[in-house]
From Swiss-Prot:
It is found in: Cytoplasm. This is Malate synthase G. Keywords: Cytoplasm, Glyoxylate bypass, Magnesium, Metal-binding, Oxidation, Transferase, Tricarboxylic acid cycle. Belongs to the malate synthase family. GlcB subfamily. The gene is glcB. One of its GO terms (molecular function) is magnesium ion binding.
Length: 735
């Protein structure tokens, strides 16, 4: 990129400089010249420290690799291994007990347990849908998914034709009544028997027939209503475990007319928080890509992001939802609730650089430092409302919420805290305005989690287990120890069970309850919602105040779990427990015996992973899609991002390193699976098949490189190869 602006010691891409100066800075109160001088100072000062931290990662990995190679024929001695990790500084002393001091945090983080969406910031439509997913129709979520089986005449009708299957609709209504019975039980009888609702002297009454009415078992669960009493269209607002439920009443509507109580929908407070992602779910490899993400982030914070959407043959403009206003039960006051999810922004980690900013010698500067500066500047608009900042606020407490991924240990968390402090100085923000969400997704952070939290104890607003990346790091860290177990077995290994408990226990021990989120990972099968409803309740039962979901519909369905589980009570019960032992966390997931694998087992593992890798990489390289719903080898749609890619590529790289498989077998597996992926993408007009010209297909070559060179990638990360290959593709396409 030749069109650059000199900023002190730096050279900034013109597209970025113009966007920040002309679009992002106005309305923030930050002087443009002072800001760019601050950028120059922060980047110049902190880039060398960033590089030192990456060198420390490499040095530790080299020492761990050497230790395992020297003991290749010996059984692993757990005590000696732990001593070694302590000696080299991989394990650090655990700090004395402490309590985090994070202040000025929104209720969505401190007190309300509920689902958390993660969405790629480069896609404006996805970002708008996610921000608006604070409230979701339970009827739509049930009708449109497999939670209601398509049996006994309950098949879905086509939304495009306006069809509606009343048999299925009746099952949806019955399911929703069961939800109400569990979340807001009546003093007598069941919501299933309701034939009407009314408000009398500030109390909600539910008519059950024969002129009999009953109230709620807990009358305080009725907190508001909309509409005018006595009119046909109105709604009732309930609350349970801090989450709201709106019962919409309209006996003249198509659905309400089939309901004996006139209820047309039950709307659940769903995605309480949403992470707008600049990291694993996006493919941003240059200044133009970054500016696209920054511009969408600006639109979200100013409240003016919009997108033309076509649905059911109609086109409309999607915008951010307004707040929701209810009348209090006594009819005298108002209750205003947020209409949108509280937004976090996930910056990239410490590893990657980006050509948006280079130094005088042309060296790219750390992308994580750039993200911290620019996403924080933009988020100032979300702290204010007015003519220059837009009508909507994000935080009501004056905080900016940044998720920082892929940090290795306390010293990297401390560096992030230092970076955030420097950014606050540049922007003129009070200390600790920038809050941090710590992803517990790297092994060195897991085993030193208490110290990592303490390193940002006045900023931390969440810790979250990211078991996908964490598995990738588990494999790479112990690459030389021996062949790892198969991917499907990994979730039942001792380390991962201890990891999930350890995260909750450490968070509670550091006083996160009531101050910060304790989160758990993603449901990766977006079409299998019945399975999610059956299984994901385990996360709040384990003490998680939030957990990741792949779609607004999934957020609405996962919200059911927080009505069923009182997470505050669970956390009170778990407080003070230490269920996970360090020995378990350090248990390497080696295969019990490679000799138990048949040739068919090995081929199946090769094919499964090659198909997963190709299915994700081809869209990343060719289309710049960072998060895909990729069919697996059995055509089950799975959410894939760089974390799942890291696992698949690292597992095959590990097996290659230990001669479980050969390079030829890997290449043959990729060539077998490429036509499968081509077939699965046949309906995509923009898709370019990989077969049969494998040698000239950049995506195919990237997938091969990720496996064959996997053991030499920094911590097993896929970004360096993906970014280089995507740039190669973009350059070729531009010719």
């Amino acid at each position: 990129m030749s069109d650059r602006v000199d900023v002190g010691n730096l050279r900034v891409a013109r597209v970025l400089y113009d966007f920040i100066t002309n679009e992002a800075l106005p309305g923030t109160g930050v002087d443009a010249d002072a800001f760019w001088a601050g950028v120059d100072k922060v980047v110049t000062d902190l880039a060398p420290r960033n590089r030192e931290l990456l060198e420390r990662r490499d040095d530790l990995q080299t020492q761990v690799d050497r230790w395992h190679r020297q003991r290749a024929i010996e059984p692993l001695d757990g005590a000696a291994y732990q001593d070694f990790l302590t000696e080299i500084g991989y394990l650090v002393p655990e700090p004395e007990d402490f309590t985090i001091t994070t202040a000025n945090v929104d209720d969505e983080i401190t007190t309300t347990a509920g689902p958390q969406l993660v969405v790629p910031i480069l896609n404006a439509r996805f970002a708008l849908n996610a921000a608006n997913a604070r409230w979701g129709s339970l009827y739509d979520a049930l009708y449109g998914t497999d939670v209601i089986p398509e049996a006994d005449g309950a098949e879905k009708a086509s939304a495009d034709t306006g069809g509606y299957n009343k048999v299925r609709g009746d099952k949806v209504i019955a399911y929703a009544r069961e939800v109400l019975d569990g979340a807001a039980p009546l003093a007598s009888g069941s919501w299933k028997d309701a034939v009407g609702l009314k408000i009398d002297d500030g109390q909600l009454l539910v008519e059950l027939g024969d002129e009999f009415s009953t109230g709620l078992q807990n009358p305080d669960q009725f907190v508001g209503y909309t509409g005018k009493l006595g009119k046909p269209q109105w709604s009732v607002l309930l609350i349970n475990h801090g989450l709201h439920i709106e019962v919409l009443i309209d006996p003249d509507s198509p659905i309400g007319s089939t309901d004996k109580a006139g209820i047309k929908d039950v709307v659940l407070e769903s995605a309480i928080t949403t992470i707008m992602d600049f990291e694993d779910s996006v493919a941003a490899v240059d200044a133009e890509d970054k500016v696209l993400g920054y511009r969408n982030w600006l639109g979200l914070n100013k409240g003016d992001l919009s997108e033309e959407v076509s649905k059911g043959g109609k086109t409309f403009t999607r915008v951010l939802n307004e707040d929701r206003v209810f009348t209090t039960p006594d009819g005298k006051g108002e209750l205003t609730l947020p209409g949108r999810s509280l937004l976090f922004v996930r910056n990239v980690g410490h590893l990657m650089t980006n050509d948006a900013i280079v130094d005088a010698a042309g060296n790219e500067m750390p992308e994580g430092i750039q993200d911290a500066l620019f996403t924080s500047l933009i988020a100032i608009h979300g702290l204010r409302s007015g003519k220059k900042n837009g009508p909507l606020k994000n935080s009501r407490t004056g905080s900016i919420y940044i998720v920082k991924p892929k940090m290795h240990g306390p010293e990297e968390v401390a560096f992030t805290a230092e970076l955030f402090g420097r950014v606050e100085e540049v922007l003129g923000l009070p200390h600790a305005t920038l809050k941090v969400g710590i992803m517990d997704e790297e092994r060195r952070t897991t085993v030193n989690l208490k110290a990592a939290i303490k390193a940002a104890s006045d900023r931390v607003v969440f810790i979250n287990t990211g078991f996908l990346d964490r598995t990738g790091d588990e494999i790479h860290t112990s690459m030389e120890a021996g062949p790892m177990c198969r991917k499907a077995v990994m979730k039942s290994q001792p380390w991962i069970l201890a990891y999930e408990d350890h995260n909750v226990d450490t968070g509670l021990g550091a006083g996160l309850a009531g101050k910060a989120q304790i989160g758990k990972g993603m449901w990766a099968m977006p079409d299998l919602m019945a399975d999610m409803v059956a299984q994901k309740i385990a996360q709040p039962r384990a003490g998680a105040t939030t957990a990741w979901v792949p779609s607004p519909t999934a957020a609405t369905l996962h919200a059911l779990h927080y009505h069923q589980v009182d997470v505050k009570a669970v956390d009170q019960e778990l407080a003070g427990k230490h269920r996970a032992k360090l020995e378990s966390l350090l248990t390497i997931p080696l295969a019990e015996s490679r000799h138990d694998w048949t040739a068919e087992d090995i081929r199946e593992e090769i094919d499964n992973n090659c198909q997963s890798i190709l299915g994700y990489v081809v869209r990343w390289i060719d289309q710049g899609v960072g998060c895909s719903k990729v069919p697996d080898i059995h055509d089950v749609a799975l959410m894939e991002d760089r974390a799942t890619l890291r696992i698949s590529s690292q597992l095959l790289a590990n097996w290659l390193r230990h001669d479980v498989i050969t390079e030829d077998e890997v290449v043959e597996g990729l060539k077998r699976m490429a036509p499968v992926v081509d077939r699965q993408n046949a309906g995509d007009k923009e898709y370019r098949p990989m077969a049969p010209d494998f040698d000239s297909n950049i995506a195919f070559q990237a997938a091969k490189e990720l496996i064959l060179e996997g053991k030499d990638q920094p911590n097993g990360y896929t970004e360096p190869i993906l970014h280089r290959r995507r740039r190669e593709y973009k350059a070729a396409a531009a010719k």
